[in-house]
Amino acid sequence: LQYKKILSLQKKINLQKEEILFYNKSKILEGSTTNLIFVKNNQLFIPKNSYYFGITLSYLTKTIPYKIKKIDILISNFYEYSEILLVGSGKGVVSISSIDQLNWYRSSLKMYKSILKEYSKVL
């Protein structure tokens, strides 16, 4: 990773409202300050590999009542997901409302509310 470039990009955005998503060969890896959870048909998915498995994601995988599957998450398939969640120590659990560049918009908050409820137990 090119840390100077990442830090430069982070300075240009409001990290409270935006996130930089990393990808390689059209496969999503993680956010610059978060891990990502994707929701499709009430099932949870995380990227298969090549990312840092953060503390918050580790906690959630052990405590939420849902199985999380590791798969390759392709940028071209974002339209399949009803929710995309950011999880991290600094942000907690956040539901992405839209990704304008991909014409993707959240269509549900169901899993977000459920996971946030579980996460709130440790706050």
Regions found by a protein language model. Name each.
Residues 1-123:
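Helix-start/capping segments and mature chain N-termini
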